[in-house]
Amino acid sequence: MTSRQSRAFFLTIFIFCVIVSNISLAQIRLEQLVQKYWLASSTIERQKAAKEIVRASPVFSELYQLLSVGKRYPVQSTGIVKVPQGGKYLPPHAVVIIPADYQPDLSYPVQVYLHGAVTNNDPFFLYRYTLDTLDASLLQTKSILIFPSGWSLAPWWCHAQADNIHRLLSWVKENYNINENQVRLRGVSDGGIGCYYLANADQTPWSVITPFIGSLRALNQLSDRQIYLSNFINSSMFIVNTNQDEIFDITWEQPYINKLLSISSKTSFVQVDSSRHSLLWYPALKDSIERFNQLHDRNPFPDALIWQTEDVVKYGRYKYIRIDKLGSLSKNNNANDENQVQMLGTFVQAFSRETPSGLLKVTKSNNVVTVETQGVLQYTILVSPDHFDLTSPVKIITNGKKSFEGIVHPDVETLLKWNLKDNDRKMLFAAEIKVKVN
């Protein structure tokens, strides 16, 4: 090797080492920034940390990998934890129960329980009549249990409780390692009504919904918003009502349940012949309910879904679709509003329709998304690398017309925006495609 060749060789090695060193330093810096993001003590601090990450111009795939792994959870308190419920009309505390053998390196299912008799006037009803905090068996649970507290000023069928339960779930996500695809909602009596309400308002987090001795029909009189049967089509529900129920007469509940069974292939219903308005039947069905839970993890990215709302600000999103703007177009009427039940041989309106709503019906095949709309002027498709092939063009067809076609470029800012909202390692988004309906 000549001296010139030798110098060239060592120069090449030097440049290679500098490049590798810079790559390693960039990776270390990104890991530090993401760690700062996870350790932020408030939403504002986390937003600031997210902006720092964006300014660092990281490689998208590296940031995506770090967010999909998530934070390193510290050792936390186990047992019974009181969590404040914010809000003017809410009872002061909810209860969260953490398994006694909780290990922060394992992810745990979550079960949210909505108690009955929510029209009571006691802000401490949860402690006095529903939850025995001295019951040691509760600590042997293999799931993280969340017990929100409701009363007459904040029943389950109002926005204040929908927001409260979202914040409680966010608190648990922030402090404990959960399996985001195994977050289950259960309610008894009034809590069963609440299950129907919450699933209809925001279904994104739930894997399974189990209303026991509740009433979907009652929401026609109780709900502070419109209820849409279409929103249950993709739900995994295990419903139990009783034949001798003296509060929710099965004769009037059955037509609504029959409608759910006809539109949702993932809904199961058990009618207990011998019971009144009680849970005496539960031991006999416990194993069946648990099997149902185990068989129905949440799918963050279903290839077919439907969503309907009259309020795009509070309830416009379902998983990877979001209704942005409502309005009527003469040809914008291709999707159907499921809103009839057969009552005593006659078809009647299931739920009132006093406010205009919008509906999206979405089906996806490979990278082609077909959308039918009713009463929608604009919507958004959220694109995840776990759902779409970002190396190939994405095509969106709205009401039979092409709305978008092209390569979707992953964006760090969008990734962080939706992670800030969801804090969900199993549902990350790389891009938004906004579509105006013509």
Language model features with spans:
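Primarily recognizes the serine-hydrolase "nucleophile elbow" in alpha/beta-hydrolase
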Residues: 181-231
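Alpha/beta-hydrolase-fold serine-hydrolase catalytic core, especially in secreted/extracellular enzymes
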Residues: 27-48, 262-267, 273-438
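Active-site machinery of serine-nucleophile hydrolases
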Residues: 108-173
